[in-house]
């Protein structure tokens, strides 16, 4: 399809530059969960602001992360909740789909992104979409109203979560906590110390250790 253009460039870099020439109806961030600092860059306040700058007035930003179907414990709730809080600090309208993967749809318009099955079915039929893998009836399976309400209420109830930023990657931190819980590791105890401590308090002993290490190496080499 000649209408499709592929740009081999870092996503953040592309979004920063795209606003100067183009506006988009939809931005779909199709990347893995923020399990690394690199991936976390696409779930931060700064990225959502940059994406918002290149969206049309009724445009939609969509992304998704792994979640849980029937129960959001502390780790999962904080994880997906931090993304919701961060997106909602940029976009007035954010909705989240239920399921093993939570899909987030954010917009400046309250009319574009919706989970209303009748509205979605009407749009699907009007556009004449033809697919052997999807039909308008699938909306009932993907978006049962009870499940939609459940995930929305659960995420909105996570008050006081910090916004995820480039310099304070809390969503990355919550992802680590979630994986620690899933694997039964004891790393979570150490991570919680980082959560309660100020960054400077953590960096000072690391800096002192590095200085001592450098001094030791210099002195040791001179003694040879």
Annotated model-derived regions:
Residues 1-84:
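The AdoMet/dcAdoMet-binding core of the Class I SAM-like
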Residues 2, 10-17, 21, 89-224:
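Soluble small-group transferase modules, centered on the S-adenosyl donor enzyme superfamily
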């Amino acid at each position: 399809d000649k209408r499709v253009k592929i740009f081999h460039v870092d996503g953040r870099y592309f979004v920063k530059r795209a606003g100067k020439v183009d506006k988009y109806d939809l931005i779909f961030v199709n990347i893995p969960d923020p399990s690394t600092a690199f991936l976390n860059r696409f779930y931060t306040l700064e990225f959502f602001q940059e994406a918002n700058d290149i969206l049309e007035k009724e445009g939609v930003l969509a992304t998704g992360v792994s979640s849980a179907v029937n129960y959001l414990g502390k780790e999962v709730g904080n994880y997906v909740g931090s993304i919701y809080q961060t997106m909602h600090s940029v976009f007035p309208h954010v909705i989240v789909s239920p399921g093993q993967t939570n899909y987030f749809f954010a917009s400046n318009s309250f009319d574009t992104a919706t989970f209303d099955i009748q509205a979605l079915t009407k749009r699907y039929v009007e556009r004449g979409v033809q697919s052997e893998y999807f039909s308008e009836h699938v909306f009932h399976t993907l978006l049962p109203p009870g499940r939609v309400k459940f995930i929305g209420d659960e995420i909105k109830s996570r008050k006081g979560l910090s916004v995820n930023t480039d310099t304070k990657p809390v969503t990355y931190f919550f992802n680590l906590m979630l994986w620690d819980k899933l694997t039964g590791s004891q790393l979570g105890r150490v991570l919680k110390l980082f959560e309660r401590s100020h960054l400077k308090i953590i960096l000072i002993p690391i800096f002192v250790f590095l200085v001592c290490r450098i001094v030791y190496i210099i002195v040791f080499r001179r003694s040879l």
